[in-house]
């Protein structure tokens, strides 16, 4: 047994959206220890620039590397769309998985007329459309930005009538295209399942990339010989914002109130000259 097998899997998101991935890890890989980080001080990511997202992710990965994680799951579609390739290039010895490709692979197995709801940044990147059509060029894809969803979820307003009204408006153009599949293009959106399911025809199949990325993570761990053979440690939770707010909001999805550490991410990056103004590298 290698020491690295006992190391935790790092999971991060801007907030509680990544808890959908965490729950899948508990279900599919219950033997693994996990370090969960929510960048709540800087959410939502979906309206940020590419340069900002890369900077944030580099800071998070630097911190996680210091915690000796054996793998990182970017449980955030926006960072997966805008920063995955760049941070994989910077952390070559650390397996880093994004949610978009696993989600796209599942989507093409479900249907041919695929709607994607996501943050504005993910929609603008065309990441899902490109990934889906690389796998199946005959698939038709429509992407809809949903800027109000993450703030509403983080404010615990899922069952607010206003949230239903907003969801109906976002889904209308997709329903007009007679989609047969809907992808949650943001890990937060799984929390809206009760609302979205009521607004969609029963024939529309839902794709949750959280389940898909954990299946991909299991295959990667197996391939690298990094599966944990021992009893896992309790999950460590950390946030950049208010720990109490995160703990209260998380309880309804985790079934318990986590102990949450507040961390201050140091700016350990230097400008390298990248698209939209900057590229950064840990220093």
From Swiss-Prot:
It catalyses: L-glutamate = D-glutamate. It is an enzyme of class 5 (isomerase). Belongs to the aspartate/glutamate racemases family. SUPFAM superfamilies: Aspartate/glutamate racemase. NCBIfam families: glut_race (TIGR00067). Keywords: Cell shape, Cell wall biogenesis/degradation, Isomerase, Peptidoglycan synthesis. Substrate binds at residues 13-14, 45-46, 77-78, 187-188. This is Glutamate racemase. The active site is at 76 (proton donor/acceptor), 186 (proton donor/acceptor). Its EC number is 5.1.1.3. HAMAP family: Glu_racemase. Provides the (R)-glutamate required for cell wall biosynthesis. Disulfide bonds: none annotated. It comes from the Bacteria. It comes from Microcystis aeruginosa (strain NIES-843 / IAM M-2473). Transmembrane segments: none annotated. The keyword Cell wall biogenesis/degradation applies. Pathway: Cell wall biogenesis; peptidoglycan biosynthesis. GO terms for biological process: cell wall organization; peptidoglycan biosynthetic process; regulation of cell shape. One of its GO terms (molecular function) is glutamate racemase activity.
